[in-house]
Every structure is written in C-alpha cells, then in structure tokens.
Amino acid sequence: MEMLLFLNESYIFHRLRMWSTVLWHSCVFVCVECENANYRVPRCLIKPFSVPVTFPFSVKKNIRILDLDPRTEAYCLSPYSVCSKRLPCKKYFYLLNSYNIKRVLGVVYC
C-alpha cells in the first residue's frame, strides 16, 4: 500500500490541520505553497509505516493524519518540489515529533 502524507507547515503549527491521501502503486510529491502534486513511481524513498485504522481505503478517500499514531510513523521528505516557486528541499528523514519537520516541502510514503 502506498500513502501520500502531505504536511503544510502553516497548517501544522497554526491551524493544526494535516491531511493524508491513500494511493495505490504510485508516489506523490506535493508542494506546500500551491498544493500541486506530481506522481512519480520510480525512485521512491521507503520508510516503515503503521496505522491504527481499518484498511482498505478507497483510493481517493482522505483521512486526517492526526488519526494516525505519530509514535510509529516515519516520513521521508521529497527531494523535489513540483512548484517552481520553491527550490527542492534536501533529502532527510524526520520523525513526526522532530523540531525540523516544519521545514518540509512535502512528504511521501511509498
């Protein structure tokens, strides 16, 4: 199962809104400025992931990322930005509770 995890830093720290989208057999990189998505199947970074929710989801169904257990999730940052307004971020791994997570452009689980 593949899952996109989109973190917008203004939503995380100011509005506490975070969303995730369930996808199948694909990876998605998302720009936090314009929210444009770019589907890329090859070269996807892999991190372990577990969720305390029922599967399977509908492909287009959205769930709140706050419904997932932050203690068991790790996210890989996209080294690419699909928006021309921002430069690509560096490739690093952070846990959800990391103080550096606010610098993320987009995250992907594949």
Curated annotation (Swiss-Prot):
Belongs to the UPF0377 family. This is Putative UPF0377 protein YKL223W. It comes from Saccharomyces cerevisiae (strain ATCC 204508 / S288c). The lineage of its organism: Eukaryota, Fungi, Dikarya, Ascomycota, Saccharomycotina.
